[in-house]
């Protein structure tokens, strides 16, 4: 809980973000975005694995069932079109190519993707090439790399690798085996493409025991990787950084501020670490923050215990600290995904339930003003 002085300081920071340059202030006079906004509605029933993105024209695409089901909103989540199927085998995570507006559901384990040229209205299946990393991880017919259950990917915007497509991914040897004895060998990685998604390179690893990752690029070109850990005795998230466009991951660390959550899992080895939970991560567009790096993170807020209390955290210093958080949903909640529009509106797609955990996938729409004013 922040004291009154710190709350005043954070509100001052928000004012700076909203009015830090003339062009943004002028834009806000025409289309105010300082009134707190918060709305929640259910989009899917009895399915799991949410993923959400905002396309280059502002269309919001909410995916469920690992990218197989889709609902579209062309008015900023106020209304939604009917459920449509991307493809019966379209399992994977989403990415928007900011270079040309294409949207893709990448199934790197299967060696293909589904692509849309029209903001998610229609889709076409394409074969892709997955190249392994230096130790041979990432081949569909060997030890595959998969994006399923990871956060959506990003188009890099800064520096030498501007325009590269980068997606969080994971390695599950052998051949995707999720048996308990193999968990120490599981680890997150990434895949990246410099040719619009036709060819993907598997990157180096992050910490062992990780899975279901999230990543975000800062305005200096550094890439922040935040991972679920299936063996977190300390109940904390795992962090890594890339300074070469996502090719290698260094500066591994344990988060001081973000806890791993999820019911303790019984291990035959005698320990009971948290089993962890998938999470969401997004960096707000610089156009909406006056050029400041503002990151948001989402996961249930119940360290080391059952999945409840879907919460969003905010960082204003490039993921060094996370001083603000706000509860979105009190009840049962689990996997989540975050996206943001150019106007600063944030979209949180998450699993929730009243009596059972996975009753629905809901979308919450809010802005930074709502998050900061009501921080808890």
Report each predicted region and the residues it spans.
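Bacterial N-terminal signal peptides that target proteins for export
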Residues: 1-10
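Sec/Tat signal peptide C-region and signal peptidase I cleavage site
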Residues: 22-24
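Asp-box/BNR beta-propeller blade signature and adjacent active/binding-site loops
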Residues: 26-376
